[in-house]
Amino acid sequence: MATPEFDLNDIKRRMQGAVASLSKDLGSLRTGRATPSLLDPIQVDAYGSMMPMAQVATVSVPEPRLLSISVWDRSMVTAVEKAIRESDLGLNPQTEGQTIRLRIPEMNEQRRKEMVKVAHKYTEEARVAVRHVRRDGLDHLKKLLKDSAISEDDEKRQATDVQKATDQYIAEIDGVLASKEKEIMQV
């Protein structure tokens, strides 16, 4: 039984946002496999402003270790190439007309371990975000109890629901990390 002042669904929605943000962050990590999301963080200087890669080109994966970037405007090819070179991905673009090819080199063991550390950092940030949402929810419940808007039993029941949601989303975050870690360490 939810009170009008307390919305568990809002808390769950905010926790799900932390999981979605983690998935996006982990998607941009290099794993040794070619994925279009690898280029998502790259901004291209196009027509006087910075634009995401997806707004100036189409990225496809013709082979497991090759990205093919089809630039829509021929005049943007050099800008896209420059943006890739200046990114911290360490990739060397090869231009063929309006198409840019990116070979994704196999990562060595040290680089894989570095990527796993970065993945753990992103994951910890997501866990902290979920815990902040939990704290906000519990603080709100305590305020409602103090203002006599809900009974002590309702506060305890809803606090238990908030903790269950927290545990569920932390487990989901751990699952996302385990999957990404396996993908990174796979040779």
UniProtKB/Swiss-Prot annotation:
One of its GO terms (cellular component) is cytosol. Keywords: Cytoplasm, Protein biosynthesis. GO terms for molecular function: ribosomal large subunit binding. One of its GO terms (biological process) is cytoplasmic translational termination. It is found in: Cytoplasm. InterPro entries: Ribosome_recyc_fac (IPR002661), Ribosome_recyc_fac_dom (IPR023584), RRF_sf (IPR036191). HAMAP family: RRF. Responsible for the release of ribosomes from messenger RNA at the termination of protein biosynthesis. May increase the efficiency of translation by recycling ribosomes from one round of translation to another. NCBIfam families: frr. Belongs to the RRF family. This is Ribosome-recycling factor. The gene is frr.
